[in-house]
Amino acid sequence: MRWRREALSHLVKAASWLSSLDLPVRLIAFPEGALQGFNDEVLDLDHATFAREGAIDIPGEETEFLGTIAKEYGAFVIAQAKARHPDLKDRFFNVGFIINPRGKVILQHYKVSPLFPVEHSVCPHDVYDWWVEKYGRNLQAFWPVVDTEIGRLGIMMANEGSYPENARALALNGAEVVYRASYPHPATGNEMFEIQSRARALDNNLYVVAPNMGTYYLFPEETTPIDTFGGRSFIINYKGQIVGRQDYGAGSTYVGGVVDIEALRDHRARAQWDNWMKDLRTELYQLLYEKPIYPKNLYLKRAPMKHKEYREKVIKRQIRLMHDRGIWVKPAR
Protein backbone atom coordinates (compact mmCIF):
# COMPACT_ATOMS: atom_id res chain seq x y z
CA MET A 1 0.00 0.00 0.00
CA ARG A 2 2.98 2.33 0.56
CA TRP A 3 3.82 2.75 -3.12
CA ARG A 4 0.15 3.32 -3.91
CA ARG A 5 0.01 6.11 -1.34
CA GLU A 6 3.08 7.71 -2.87
CA ALA A 7 1.55 7.52 -6.34
CA LEU A 8 -1.70 9.11 -5.16
CA SER A 9 0.17 11.83 -3.28
CA HIS A 10 2.25 12.70 -6.35
CA LEU A 11 -0.81 12.74 -8.60
CA VAL A 12 -2.70 15.07 -6.25
CA LYS A 13 0.29 17.38 -6.05
CA ALA A 14 0.51 17.73 -9.84
CA ALA A 15 -3.24 17.95 -10.39
CA SER A 16 -3.83 20.50 -7.63
CA TRP A 17 -0.91 22.67 -8.66
CA LEU A 18 -2.06 22.99 -12.27
CA SER A 19 -5.79 23.16 -11.53
CA SER A 20 -5.29 25.91 -8.95
CA LEU A 21 -3.91 28.19 -11.66
CA ASP A 22 -7.57 28.81 -12.48
CA LEU A 23 -9.46 28.57 -9.17
CA PRO A 24 -8.70 27.13 -5.72
CA VAL A 25 -9.06 23.35 -5.51
CA ARG A 26 -11.79 22.52 -3.00
CA LEU A 27 -12.70 18.95 -4.00
CA ILE A 28 -10.38 16.02 -4.77
CA ALA A 29 -12.02 12.82 -6.02
CA PHE A 30 -10.19 9.51 -6.38
CA PRO A 31 -11.76 6.87 -8.63
CA GLU A 32 -13.26 3.65 -7.35
CA GLY A 33 -10.39 1.15 -7.11
CA ALA A 34 -7.68 3.72 -6.40
CA LEU A 35 -6.87 2.20 -3.00
CA GLN A 36 -7.36 -1.54 -3.58
CA GLY A 37 -7.96 -2.22 -7.26
CA PHE A 38 -10.53 -4.86 -8.19
CA ASN A 39 -8.64 -8.10 -7.64
CA ASP A 40 -11.38 -9.57 -5.46
CA GLU A 41 -13.69 -9.29 -8.46
CA VAL A 42 -11.28 -10.23 -11.25
CA LEU A 43 -9.93 -13.27 -9.40
CA ASP A 44 -13.36 -14.34 -8.07
CA LEU A 45 -12.01 -14.49 -4.52
CA ASP A 46 -13.87 -15.97 -1.58
CA HIS A 47 -15.93 -13.26 0.10
CA ALA A 48 -15.17 -14.11 3.73
CA THR A 49 -11.45 -14.47 3.05
CA PHE A 50 -11.26 -11.08 1.36
CA ALA A 51 -13.32 -9.53 4.15
CA ARG A 52 -10.70 -10.68 6.65
CA GLU A 53 -7.55 -10.10 4.59
CA GLY A 54 -8.26 -7.44 1.97
CA ALA A 55 -11.06 -5.18 3.18
CA ILE A 56 -10.32 -2.16 5.36
CA ASP A 57 -11.98 -0.39 8.27
CA ILE A 58 -13.48 3.10 7.98
CA PRO A 59 -12.18 5.16 9.67
CA GLY A 60 -8.79 3.52 9.63
CA GLU A 61 -5.23 3.74 8.39
CA GLU A 62 -6.24 4.42 4.78
CA THR A 63 -8.71 7.19 5.60
CA GLU A 64 -6.12 8.72 7.91
CA PHE A 65 -3.73 8.91 4.95
CA LEU A 66 -6.38 10.54 2.75
CA GLY A 67 -7.15 12.87 5.63
CA THR A 68 -3.59 14.18 5.50
CA ILE A 69 -4.17 15.06 1.84
CA ALA A 70 -7.42 16.81 2.72
CA LYS A 71 -5.69 18.85 5.41
CA GLU A 72 -2.66 19.67 3.27
CA TYR A 73 -4.76 21.05 0.41
CA GLY A 74 -7.66 22.41 2.44
CA ALA A 75 -10.01 20.34 0.29
CA PHE A 76 -12.73 17.75 0.60
CA VAL A 77 -11.69 14.26 -0.50
CA ILE A 78 -13.99 11.61 -1.97
CA ALA A 79 -12.78 8.04 -2.35
CA GLN A 80 -13.90 4.40 -2.20
CA ALA A 81 -12.87 1.15 -0.56
CA LYS A 82 -14.04 -2.39 0.02
CA ALA A 83 -14.66 -2.12 3.75
CA ARG A 84 -15.90 -4.16 6.67
CA HIS A 85 -18.93 -3.30 8.78
CA PRO A 86 -18.27 -3.53 12.54
CA ASP A 87 -21.53 -5.42 13.13
CA LEU A 88 -21.25 -8.03 10.36
CA LYS A 89 -18.49 -10.60 10.72
CA ASP A 90 -16.74 -11.88 7.56
CA ARG A 91 -18.64 -9.50 5.31
CA PHE A 92 -17.54 -6.47 3.34
CA PHE A 93 -19.34 -3.69 1.51
CA ASN A 94 -18.30 -1.33 -1.26
CA VAL A 95 -18.14 2.01 0.52
CA GLY A 96 -17.75 5.50 -0.85
CA PHE A 97 -16.72 8.11 1.70
CA ILE A 98 -16.10 11.83 2.05
CA ILE A 99 -13.39 13.44 4.18
CA ASN A 100 -13.54 17.11 5.15
CA PRO A 101 -10.57 19.54 5.09
CA ARG A 102 -9.91 18.76 8.75
CA GLY A 103 -9.30 15.10 7.89
CA LYS A 104 -12.53 13.69 9.32
CA VAL A 105 -14.79 11.17 7.56
CA ILE A 106 -18.15 12.96 7.32
CA LEU A 107 -20.11 10.58 5.08
CA GLN A 108 -20.14 6.88 4.26
CA HIS A 109 -22.27 5.52 1.43
CA TYR A 110 -22.74 1.77 1.11
CA LYS A 111 -23.10 0.91 -2.57
CA VAL A 112 -26.65 -0.28 -3.30
CA SER A 113 -26.10 -1.65 -6.83
CA PRO A 114 -22.96 -3.79 -7.21
CA LEU A 115 -21.73 -4.68 -10.69
CA PHE A 116 -23.35 -8.02 -11.43
CA PRO A 117 -22.19 -10.75 -11.71
CA VAL A 118 -18.55 -9.99 -10.93
CA GLU A 119 -18.69 -7.85 -7.78
CA HIS A 120 -18.77 -9.74 -4.49
CA SER A 121 -19.69 -6.85 -2.20
CA VAL A 122 -22.70 -7.08 0.08
CA CYS A 123 -25.08 -4.16 -0.38
CA PRO A 124 -27.81 -2.79 1.94
CA HIS A 125 -30.57 -4.40 -0.14
CA ASP A 126 -28.87 -7.79 0.30
CA VAL A 127 -29.38 -7.47 4.07
CA TYR A 128 -32.42 -5.24 3.81
CA ASP A 129 -34.32 -6.24 6.95
CA TRP A 130 -31.19 -5.91 9.10
CA TRP A 131 -30.29 -2.58 7.48
CA VAL A 132 -33.71 -1.02 7.97
CA GLU A 133 -33.81 -2.12 11.60
CA LYS A 134 -30.41 -0.53 12.22
CA TYR A 135 -30.56 2.62 10.05
CA GLY A 136 -34.23 3.16 9.25
CA ARG A 137 -36.16 3.27 5.99
CA ASN A 138 -35.45 6.71 4.60
CA LEU A 139 -33.35 8.37 1.92
CA GLN A 140 -30.46 9.14 4.25
CA ALA A 141 -30.18 5.45 5.18
CA PHE A 142 -29.52 4.39 1.58
CA TRP A 143 -28.48 7.54 -0.31
CA PRO A 144 -26.84 9.81 2.27
CA VAL A 145 -26.02 13.45 1.50
CA VAL A 146 -23.83 15.78 3.54
CA ASP A 147 -24.18 19.58 3.59
CA THR A 148 -20.81 21.34 3.33
CA GLU A 149 -19.45 24.81 2.59
CA ILE A 150 -18.85 23.75 -1.05
CA GLY A 151 -22.34 22.31 -1.55
CA ARG A 152 -24.36 19.23 -0.73
CA LEU A 153 -22.33 16.13 -1.61
CA GLY A 154 -23.46 12.59 -2.36
CA ILE A 155 -22.07 9.37 -3.84
CA MET A 156 -23.24 7.12 -6.68
CA MET A 157 -20.52 4.61 -7.52
CA ALA A 158 -20.00 2.89 -10.86
CA ASN A 159 -22.94 0.59 -11.57
CA GLU A 160 -25.20 2.64 -9.30
CA GLY A 161 -25.25 5.22 -12.06
CA SER A 162 -26.68 2.62 -14.44
CA TYR A 163 -30.00 2.97 -12.63
CA PRO A 164 -31.68 6.41 -12.82
CA GLU A 165 -33.35 5.80 -9.46
CA ASN A 166 -30.08 6.17 -7.55
CA ALA A 167 -29.34 9.63 -8.92
CA ARG A 168 -32.94 10.70 -8.39
CA ALA A 169 -32.83 9.48 -4.78
CA LEU A 170 -29.70 11.53 -4.11
CA ALA A 171 -31.25 14.58 -5.75
CA LEU A 172 -34.45 14.24 -3.73
CA ASN A 173 -32.27 14.02 -0.64
CA GLY A 174 -30.76 17.38 -1.56
CA ALA A 175 -27.57 16.45 -3.45
CA GLU A 176 -25.91 19.08 -5.63
CA VAL A 177 -22.60 17.37 -6.44
CA VAL A 178 -22.51 13.61 -6.95
CA TYR A 179 -19.41 11.42 -7.25
CA ARG A 180 -19.76 8.70 -9.89
CA ALA A 181 -16.74 6.41 -10.41
CA SER A 182 -15.48 4.03 -11.97
CA TYR A 183 -16.75 2.24 -15.10
CA PRO A 184 -14.92 -0.40 -17.18
CA HIS A 185 -14.21 -0.64 -20.87
CA PRO A 186 -15.94 -1.38 -23.29
CA ALA A 187 -18.68 0.61 -21.51
CA THR A 188 -16.44 3.67 -21.72
CA GLY A 189 -15.45 3.22 -25.35
CA ASN A 190 -19.04 2.73 -26.49
CA GLU A 191 -20.04 5.90 -24.57
CA MET A 192 -22.33 4.16 -22.07
CA PHE A 193 -20.47 5.75 -19.14
CA GLU A 194 -20.73 9.23 -20.66
CA ILE A 195 -24.37 8.93 -21.72
CA GLN A 196 -25.45 7.68 -18.30
CA SER A 197 -23.47 10.27 -16.36
CA ARG A 198 -24.67 13.20 -18.46
CA ALA A 199 -28.27 12.00 -18.28
CA ARG A 200 -28.13 11.68 -14.48
CA ALA A 201 -26.76 15.22 -14.22
CA LEU A 202 -29.35 16.67 -16.59
CA ASP A 203 -32.33 14.78 -15.17
CA ASN A 204 -31.63 16.01 -11.66
CA ASN A 205 -29.87 19.36 -12.25
CA LEU A 206 -26.76 18.34 -10.34
CA TYR A 207 -23.02 18.12 -10.97
CA VAL A 208 -21.55 14.68 -11.63
CA VAL A 209 -17.86 14.21 -10.87
CA ALA A 210 -16.81 11.02 -12.65
CA PRO A 211 -13.11 10.11 -12.35
CA ASN A 212 -12.28 6.79 -13.99
CA MET A 213 -9.47 4.37 -13.19
CA GLY A 214 -6.10 4.38 -14.90
CA THR A 215 -3.99 1.29 -15.46
CA TYR A 216 -3.24 -1.11 -12.64
CA TYR A 217 -1.27 -4.27 -11.91
CA LEU A 218 -3.23 -7.46 -11.38
CA PHE A 219 -0.43 -9.19 -9.43
CA PRO A 220 2.51 -7.73 -7.46
CA GLU A 221 5.05 -9.45 -9.73
CA GLU A 222 3.54 -8.08 -12.96
CA THR A 223 5.60 -5.57 -14.95
CA THR A 224 2.94 -4.54 -17.46
CA PRO A 225 -0.08 -2.58 -16.19
CA ILE A 226 -3.49 -3.18 -17.74
CA ASP A 227 -5.92 -0.51 -18.87
CA THR A 228 -9.30 -2.18 -18.42
CA PHE A 229 -11.23 1.06 -17.91
CA GLY A 230 -10.50 3.10 -21.01
CA GLY A 231 -10.19 6.55 -19.47
CA ARG A 232 -12.90 9.11 -20.23
CA SER A 233 -13.13 10.88 -16.90
CA PHE A 234 -15.61 13.75 -16.72
CA ILE A 235 -16.95 16.63 -14.72
CA ILE A 236 -20.51 17.35 -15.85
CA ASN A 237 -22.64 20.34 -14.92
CA TYR A 238 -26.29 20.57 -13.94
CA LYS A 239 -27.37 20.89 -17.59
CA GLY A 240 -25.59 17.72 -18.64
CA GLN A 241 -22.72 19.63 -20.26
CA ILE A 242 -19.13 18.44 -19.88
CA VAL A 243 -17.01 21.09 -18.15
CA GLY A 244 -13.96 18.86 -17.63
CA ARG A 245 -12.87 15.90 -19.74
CA GLN A 246 -9.90 13.51 -19.80
CA ASP A 247 -10.00 10.81 -22.48
CA TYR A 248 -6.62 9.30 -21.60
CA GLY A 249 -6.67 6.17 -19.46
CA ALA A 250 -3.42 4.25 -20.00
CA GLY A 251 -1.49 5.71 -17.12
CA SER A 252 -1.89 8.14 -14.24
CA THR A 253 -3.69 11.37 -15.03
CA TYR A 254 -6.45 13.70 -13.82
CA VAL A 255 -9.38 15.86 -14.89
CA GLY A 256 -10.21 19.31 -13.56
CA GLY A 257 -13.16 21.64 -13.94
CA VAL A 258 -15.25 24.34 -12.30
CA VAL A 259 -18.21 23.42 -10.09
CA ASP A 260 -20.43 26.50 -9.76
CA ILE A 261 -22.88 25.76 -6.96
CA GLU A 262 -24.46 29.22 -7.04
CA ALA A 263 -25.24 28.84 -10.74
CA LEU A 264 -26.85 25.47 -10.02
CA ARG A 265 -28.96 26.92 -7.22
CA ASP A 266 -29.97 29.86 -9.37
CA HIS A 267 -31.05 27.54 -12.20
CA ARG A 268 -33.11 25.37 -9.86
CA ALA A 269 -34.83 28.45 -8.42
CA ARG A 270 -35.31 30.44 -11.63
CA ALA A 271 -36.01 27.99 -14.47
CA GLN A 272 -39.62 27.36 -15.45
CA TRP A 273 -39.18 24.16 -17.43
CA ASP A 274 -35.86 22.32 -17.14
CA ASN A 275 -35.66 22.20 -13.34
CA TRP A 276 -37.49 18.90 -13.67
CA MET A 277 -37.88 17.64 -10.12
CA LYS A 278 -40.46 20.23 -9.10
CA ASP A 279 -42.92 18.58 -11.51
CA LEU A 280 -42.67 14.94 -10.38
CA ARG A 281 -46.09 13.26 -10.43
CA THR A 282 -45.20 10.91 -7.63
CA GLU A 283 -48.61 9.24 -7.28
CA LEU A 284 -48.27 7.97 -10.85
CA TYR A 285 -44.67 6.82 -10.58
CA GLN A 286 -45.34 4.77 -7.46
CA LEU A 287 -47.17 2.29 -9.69
CA LEU A 288 -43.85 1.37 -11.29
CA TYR A 289 -42.48 -0.19 -8.14
CA GLU A 290 -45.41 -1.92 -6.46
CA LYS A 291 -44.20 -5.36 -7.57
CA PRO A 292 -40.73 -6.38 -6.36
CA ILE A 293 -38.24 -7.37 -9.06
CA TYR A 294 -34.79 -8.03 -7.59
CA PRO A 295 -34.92 -10.14 -4.39
CA LYS A 296 -34.09 -8.42 -1.13
CA ASN A 297 -32.19 -10.12 1.73
CA LEU A 298 -30.25 -12.27 -0.74
CA TYR A 299 -27.24 -12.42 1.58
CA LEU A 300 -28.91 -12.05 4.94
CA LYS A 301 -28.04 -15.65 5.83
CA ARG A 302 -25.26 -16.55 3.40
CA ALA A 303 -22.11 -15.13 1.82
CA PRO A 304 -22.25 -13.56 -1.66
CA MET A 305 -22.07 -15.96 -4.58
CA LYS A 306 -19.14 -16.38 -6.91
CA HIS A 307 -19.48 -15.52 -10.60
CA LYS A 308 -20.77 -18.83 -11.99
CA GLU A 309 -23.25 -19.48 -9.19
CA TYR A 310 -24.64 -15.95 -9.46
CA ARG A 311 -25.20 -16.27 -13.19
CA GLU A 312 -27.01 -19.56 -12.73
CA LYS A 313 -29.09 -18.75 -9.66
CA VAL A 314 -29.82 -15.04 -10.02
CA ILE A 315 -29.29 -13.63 -13.51
CA LYS A 316 -31.10 -16.43 -15.33
CA ARG A 317 -33.94 -16.26 -12.81
CA GLN A 318 -34.30 -12.49 -13.22
CA ILE A 319 -34.45 -12.74 -17.00
CA ARG A 320 -37.05 -15.48 -16.71
CA LEU A 321 -39.07 -13.24 -14.36
CA MET A 322 -39.15 -10.45 -16.95
CA HIS A 323 -40.35 -12.89 -19.59
CA ASP A 324 -42.93 -14.51 -17.31
CA ARG A 325 -44.44 -11.11 -16.42
CA GLY A 326 -44.69 -10.21 -20.08
CA ILE A 327 -42.39 -7.22 -19.66
CA TRP A 328 -39.83 -8.59 -22.11
CA VAL A 329 -40.53 -10.68 -25.22
CA LYS A 330 -38.42 -13.79 -25.66
CA PRO A 331 -36.14 -13.79 -28.71
CA ALA A 332 -37.12 -16.04 -31.61
CA ARG A 333 -33.99 -18.15 -31.13
What is each PLM-predicted segment?
Residues 4-7, 76, 142-145, 330-333:
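Eukaryotic scaffold repeat domains enriched in small/polar residues
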Residues 85-176, 185-199, 229:
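Active-site catalytic loop in hydrolytic enzyme cores
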Residues 5, 9-102, 106-110, 117, ...:
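Cys-nucleophile CN-hydrolase/nitrilase-fold catalytic domain and related Cys-dependent amidase chemistry
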Residues 1-5, 55, 120-128:
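Acidic/histidine-rich helix-loop elements
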Residues 212-333:
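C-terminal beta-strand edge segments of enzyme domains
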Residues 55-78, 152, 158-256, 332:
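CN hydrolase (nitrilase-like) catalytic-core segments centered on the catalytic cysteine
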Residues 36, 106, 162-164, 216, ...:
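Short, acidic Gly/Pro/Ser/Thr-rich loop/turn segments
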Residues 1-2, 41-47, 221-226:
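Short, flexible/disordered intra-domain loops and linkers
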